[in-house]
A protein has these predicted regions:
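Periodic self-assembly scaffolds
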Residues: 48-107, 138, 142, 146
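N-terminal leader/targeting and pre-domain segments
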Residues: 92-94, 103-110, 115-121, 125-128, ...
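Short hydrophobic membrane-inserting helices
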Residues: 1-73, 77
Length: 555
């Protein structure tokens, strides 16, 4: 039966009385029981248990035991009250602690706005200390997420200061000199004043970045196989917003563990930048960022990264970088060498309309889905030994100097339609596992496909070869289409080296109609063909080529 309100109130009242008086009730009960036992039990026991025992001895033993129990209970209750009192004092003290920290935070913000650099620096140190205090305060703020939120507020203030404009940032190069340049605005005296203020502000901002970096890793853990794992630091769980910041000083976040979002979009790095061996667990946004000096982003582990519209004026080093999710380099401008040696792109890698003014190195890089549509390579482009697990799109790409695609494996569709190769293009020993298209591509110099393997359809329709086109030792297994192609020189399907002849091979397992060698009627050179029969089936293939069985590699 449900308890009536009256009974409920009675029950609550009983529990309330019991919770307040249980100790004294138990204490009195024990004293009464043991007292009665001490005086009553000897009357019940007729004789001592053994020689030498007496009634008084038994009574004393019972009273002694009772006293011990009461003493223990009293001590326990005293300790319990002390703990409760301490907890109450802590609870009463918590608001005071939090209020005191927030007051220090407000004061530190005032200091950051002060005209004097030492005062601003004092505010910075206070803010750094406050973040550490919040994170370590499990006593007054047990919830970890709440501690992080309190720290994030202060981190936001530090980032806001880094983002704030500095009027002398535009004179970084001049103020970094030992003496005033000629015609310096305000003369030598003004230069001395500006330089002192410039150095003070530079030191202050570097102090903030150093404090952040020192707390973004807790060292590394070395595994049995020798690999190292970067450990997150106490500040790794914060979001960092450095968007549109002008970094007029070197930036070093090497070996830093960014466990939350990192925003460097629109930032300007006027000095050397070092992110080597850093790790970005969440999105790293470098879109529209400008790197005026060397950018070391080697061995960095990215999850989701955006470099779209970024500009690299000096060398950009992405060697051994790893991108776990999509990465966007569309419309990026690399003025100097860009090196992606052994970089690993686990998902989509977008280099749409990217511009490489000097050498572009992608040797041994591993791509999944790669988009280089409309990309421009002003100097050598090296993709040798790279691997493309899915689609590789170089449609409309322009290669002004040598293009090296030797020993590459394309596991999926490869698109080079309308691409322009101004200098030599080398596709020797390439494996095209799926369809490949060079439709309307233009080769101004030598184009080598020697030793290449075309497993599926190979399309060269409307392609234009101005110089030599070498297909010797290449293997064509399926459809091969040279419809309306143009050859300014005689195409090569046979090559002799040390008295050994290497011929292009065409599969006799393909449909004879899938071989099309009808080049443009305006082509100065045609593909000379011959008719060859296999098992009663006639094939038309280049004169210097031969039929083969792709299932018998030794043939």
């Amino acid at each position: 039966m449900a308890e009536t309100p009256k009974n409920s109130e009675t029950s609550k009242g009983t529990r309330s009385w019991w919770s307040k008086n249980w100790f004294y009730t138990v204490l009195i009960a024990i004293a009464l029981i043991d007292g009665l036992s001490a005086f009553g039990l000897p009357l019940i026991v007729s004789q001592p248990y053994s020689a030498g025992d007496s009634i008084s001895t038994l009574r004393q033993a019972i009273l002694a035991a009772t006293g011990g129990v009461l003493a223990i209970l009293t001590l326990w209750e005293s300790r319990r009250k002390n703990i409760q009192e301490k907890e109450k004092n802590d609870q009463d003290h918590t608001p005071q602690v939090h209020a005191e920290r927030r007051a220090r935070y407000a004061k530190a913000l005032e200091q950051l706005a002060d005209a004097k650099a030492p005062v601003r620096l004092g505010g910075v140190y206070t803010l750094i200390k406050l973040v550490d205090e919040w994170l370590a305060d499990e006593k007054t703020l047990p919830n970890e997420e709440e501690r992080r939120e309190e720290g994030q507020v202060i981190i936001n203030s530090l980032c806001a200061y880094i983002r704030s404009p500095f009027d002398l940032a535009s004179k970084t190069e001049e103020l970094s000199e030992h003496k005033a340049p000629e015609n310096y605005e305000g003369g030598n005296q003004q230069f001395i004043k500006d330089q002192a203020r410039f150095r003070e502000e530079k030191e202050l901002r570097l102090t903030i970045l150093e404090a952040v970096r020192n707390r973004l890793n807790k060292g590394t853990r070395v595994h049995k196989n020798g690999t190292q794992k970067l450990l997150p630091g106490q500040w790794s769980g914060f979001d960092y917003d450095f968007s549109n910041t002008v970094f007029f000083y070197p930036v070093g976040f090497n070996n830093s563990y960014f466990g939350a979002s990192s925003n460097f979009s629109g930032a300007e790095f006027t000095e050397n930048t070092n992110f080597s061996k850093a790790k970005f667990v969440e999105k790293a946004d470098f879109s529209r960022a400008k790197f005026a000096k060397k950018a070391d982003i080697s061995r960095v582990k990215f999850t989701d990264a955006d470099f779209s519209g970024a500009e690299f004026t000096e060398k950009a080093d992405f060697c051994w970088a790893k991108f776990a999710e999509d990465v966007d380099f569309s419309r990026v401008k690399f003025t100097k060498n860009a090196n992606f040696y052994e970089a690993k792109f686990t998902k989509d890698a977008k280099f749409y309309r990217a511009e490489f003014t000097e050498k572009a190195g992608f040797t041994r890089a591993k791509f999944t889905d790669a988009d280089f549509t409309g990309a421009k390579f002003a100097e050598d482009a090296n993709f040798s030994w790279a691997k493309f697990a899915e689609k590789a799109d170089f449609c409309w790409a322009e290669f002004a100097e040598k293009a090296d695609f030797t020993w590459i494996k394309f596991a999926d569709y490869a698109q080079f339609g309308w691409a322009k190769f101004t200098e030599d293009a080398n596709f020797s020993a390439v494996k095209f596992t799926k369809d490949v298209e060079f439709s309307a591509a233009k080769f101004a110099k030598n184009a080598s496909f020697s030793g290449a393997k075309f497993t599926k359809n190979a399309k060269f329709s409307w392609a234009k070869f101005t110089k030599g086109a070498d297909f010797s030792w290449a293997e064509f297994i399926r459809n091969t289409d040279f419809f309306e192609a143009t050859f300014e020189e005689k195409p090569i399907f046979e090559y002799e080296l040390y008295s050994e002849i290497f011929k292009a091979k065409f599969s006799h397992r393909a449909n004879p109609e899938d071989y099309n060698f009808k080049v443009s009627h305006n082509s100065p050179y045609k593909i000379e063909t011959k008719e060859q029969e296999h098992n009663g089936i006639k094939f038309v293939i280049p004169k210097d080529a031969e039929l083969f069985d792709p299932d018998e590699p030794s043939e």
